[in-house]
Each structure stands twice: as structure tokens, then as C-alpha cells.
């Protein structure tokens, strides 16, 4: 936690899901909350590769994401500050079918369901996962939901994250060893509501506010990218 404090608070650098959520979990526990560290599988519908999104969008990666469960008024809530622009921007109750507005106009929902990769002959007999989905434009006719990640209520230990972190930070197939990315949230004038984000991916910075998305900067060199971001 001390190293994370220096990186996140002092140097204002942020981090991956395991860094951000470990730091937040430590802060919440220091305030007296009951917090459980958990793990998730990111949906391949979130893949940066178009062919993967097209052909494997109904499947998930292995355990590669961290989130928290916090007990509030005897009810468990999911808390996650490590999924970038697609993550929830508020705690969500573990209630099957829960839906709410996230960063407008986007909506999020939570479902308790089996994922498509279960080996159960009857999908209803498969292990149920909590599934976090997003709907980008709910006003455009029937809602289309895109899976973001699935997770369980099983407590993950530091040694579990050691394995997860080793893979995500060293394996050549990992997103984090192939791409540079960073996200900053954009607040409204009162600094109360998140209205969008600035996201650097590879050499391009894009700004998203509401349903409007535009390229605001494109870097030509690594030095330019470091200075500009």
C-alpha cells in the first residue's frame, strides 16, 4: 500500500486493476468497511482485436481482473475502479437483473447466469457467475447488452493476484504487454458527476463525452506521447 500511495496519490500515475483496487480496498478497510478481494474474467467482447470481438464475443479470458465486494448496510456491493472507461462509476448491488445509468447515456446491468463456455449439457446447470454488462445507447430501440466481465464472490488472496499479475504483465498474449493505454475521467463543472473520459490507446487520444467521441491528439514519437499525456 505504501508504494501504491506514492504511485497513485503522490505521482498521480494510476495503475492496473490490481493496483487501483488493492489501494482502494485498503482505504475502505481503514474506514471500517468489510471488503472482500475478488477476481473476474474480462469478456472478449472488450478485446482490442476486431477478429476476436467478431468471433469470440460470447467468451471470456481467464482470471485476469480484480474487483472488490464491500458490505454496506448488510448488503454486498461490487466496487471497481480498475476497468477504465468501461468500468462501473458507482458501487452496484449484487442483485440479479439490476440496471442503472452509468456515465450517460450508457447503462449497466448485473445478471446472475451461466457463461456460454460451461460444459454443462444443460446451461441452466452450469456454474452461475455474476456478469457485468453495458448498453452503450439505450435510447436506440431495443437495448443491446455487451458483456464486460464476469466474477464470483470467492475471496482471492495475494498469492492469487501474484499469479494473475505475472501473466498479465509478462505474457506476450496479454493486452498489457502489447499496448499502451491510459484513461482519465472527465467530471462536470461541479466535480460531482463523471460525464466522459480521455483515453490514450497506442498513439491516439480520444475524448468521449456522452455519445460523442472524437480524436483529440495523435502522437508520432514515444517522446511526444510521454510529454503530451
Predicted regions and their residues:
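Intrinsic-disorder/low-complexity, polar/charged segments
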Residues: 1, 157-159, 221
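Generic detector of short, locally flexible boundary/turn motifs and exposed helical patches
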Residues: 1-2, 32-38, 145-150
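Secondary-structure boundary elements
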Residues: 1-12
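Residues that form generic nucleotide/phosphate-binding pockets
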Residues: 7, 185, 228-229
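Cysteine-centered nucleophilic/redox motifs
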Residues: 12-41, 68, 182
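His-Asp-centered catalytic microenvironments across diverse enzyme cores
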Residues: 43-207
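A conserved C-terminal secondary-structure "cap"
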Residues: 209-229
Amino acid at each position: 500500500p505504501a508504494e501504491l500511495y506514492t504511485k497513485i496519490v503522490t505521482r498521480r500515475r494510476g495503475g492496473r486493476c490490481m493496483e487501483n483496487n488493492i489501494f482502494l480496498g485498503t482505504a475502505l478497510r481503514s474506514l471500517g468497511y468489510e471488503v472482500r478481494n475478488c477476481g473476474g474474467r474480462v469478456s472478449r467482447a472488450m478485446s482490442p482485436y476486431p477478429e476476436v470481438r467478431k468471433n469470440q464475443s460470447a467468451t471470456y479470458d481467464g482470471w485476469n481482473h480484480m474487483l472488490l465486494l464491500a458490505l454496506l448496510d448488510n448488503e454486498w456491493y461490487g466496487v471497481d475502479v480498475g476497468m477504465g472507461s468501461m468500468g462501473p462509476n458507482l458501487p452496484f448491488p449484487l442483485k440479479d437483473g439490476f440496471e442503472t445509468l452509468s456515465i450517460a447515456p450508457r447503462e449497466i446491468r448485473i445478471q446472475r447466469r451461466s457463461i456460454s463456455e460451461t460444459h454443462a449439457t444443460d446451461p441452466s446447470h452450469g456454474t452461475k457467475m455474476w456478469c457485468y454488462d453495458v448498453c452503450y445507447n439505450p435510447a436506440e430501440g431495443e437495448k443491446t447488452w455487451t458483456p464486460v466481465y464476469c466474477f464470483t464472490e470467492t475471496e482471492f488472496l495475494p498469492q492469487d493476484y501474484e499469479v494473475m499479475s505475472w501473466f498479465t504483465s509478462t505474457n506476450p498474449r496479454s493486452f498489457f504487454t502489447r499496448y499502451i493505454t491510459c484513461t482519465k475521467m472527465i467530471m462536470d463543472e461541479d466535480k460531482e458527476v463523471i460525464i466522459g473520459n480521455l483515453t490514450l490507446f497506442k498513439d491516439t487520444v480520444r475524448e468521449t463525452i456522452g455519445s460523442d467521441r472524437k480524436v483529440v491528439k495523435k502522437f508520432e514519437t514515444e517522446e511526444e506521447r510521454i510529454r503530451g499525456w
